[in-house]
């Protein structure tokens, strides 16, 4: 499962946590690397190219949950 697929399991109309917030933001971003399973690629994208700001420490926590899923 890609990180994008994992995030899409957390999408919701009302933000209930950080994963939901990131999922909703990524869903609206057509350039997000949807096929990636690579931490560095996604982290770099969020840091340098994403059209939104998201705290990378929170991303690290969500990534750890992704790895455990």
UniProtKB/Swiss-Prot annotation:
SUPFAM superfamilies: YozE-like. InterPro entries: UPF0346, YozE_SAM-like, YozE_SAM-like_sf. Disulfide bonds: none annotated. Coiled coil: none annotated. Signal peptide: none annotated. Pfam families: YozE_SAM_like. Transmembrane segments: none annotated. NCBIfam families: PRK13672.1. Belongs to the UPF0346 family. This is UPF0346 protein YuiB. It comes from Lactococcus lactis subsp. lactis (strain IL1403). The lineage of its organism: Bacteria, Bacillati, Bacillota, Bacilli, Lactobacillales.
